[in-house]
Amino acid sequence: MSDRVYLTKDGYNRLRDELTVLKSDVRKEVLEKIAEARAHGDLSENAEYDAAREQQRQLENKIGDLESKLTRATILDPKQVKTDRVYILTSVKLKNLDAQKEEIIEYTLVSSDEADTDLGKISVRSPVGKSLLGKAVGDKVQIQVPKGELHYEILEIFVK
């Protein structure tokens, strides 16, 4: 998998810190669980040992995934992001054209690894993100979501 992973500096640092914790603290805890389970004797019918080994497999997969993402990461500088169109790292103000009263919402488009809907950060790979990418102020967009179709007008594009 050679797809670039676009991250902010904070997003990169957060993933790097998570990897450090997994490789040191969590890996050590899992190895201790395996050693403890081994000490109980017969491994052929040792559910505790099997569970610890499964936890180790999952941990190593997560570590490998994070290492791969960090290797493929391109750190984006918000100061260099254009605001003529919607791109990754731009924020957009949208007017909901379906609402009875005026409803303005704001999203920031980020990578899947940094998405957090509670903070208004949506993935560029989400239905909303895909529909907004490349659009300009004044454009009207239709967005297919599981609940149906949404209609918005782009009011503003900016970088936070």
Swiss-Prot record:
Q: Name one GO biological process term.
A: regulation of DNA-templated transcription elongation
* Role description: Necessary for efficient RNA polymerase transcription elongation past template-encoded arresting sites. The arresting sites in DNA have the property of trapping a certain fraction of elongating RNA polymerases that pass through, resulting in locked ternary complexes. Cleavage of the nascent transcript by cleavage factors such as GreA or GreB allows the resumption of elongation from the new 3'terminus. GreA releases sequences of 2 to 3 nucleotides.
Coiled-coil-forming residues are 43-76
An example of a GO molecular function for this protein is: DNA binding
Fetch the InterPro entries from UniProt: GreA/GreB_C_sf, TF_GreA/GreB_CS, Tscrpt_elong_fac_GreA, Tscrpt_elong_fac_GreA/B, Tscrpt_elong_fac_GreA/B_C, Tscrpt_elong_fac_GreA/B_fam, Tscrpt_elong_fac_GreA/B_N, Tscrpt_elong_fac_GreA/B_N_sf
As for family, the record states: Belongs to the GreA/GreB family.
Gene this chain is encoded by: greA
Family matches, as Pfam families: GreA_GreB, GreA_GreB_N
Source organism, top-level taxon: Bacteria
- Which named protein is this? Transcription elongation factor GreA
Q: Does the keyword Calcium apply?
A: no
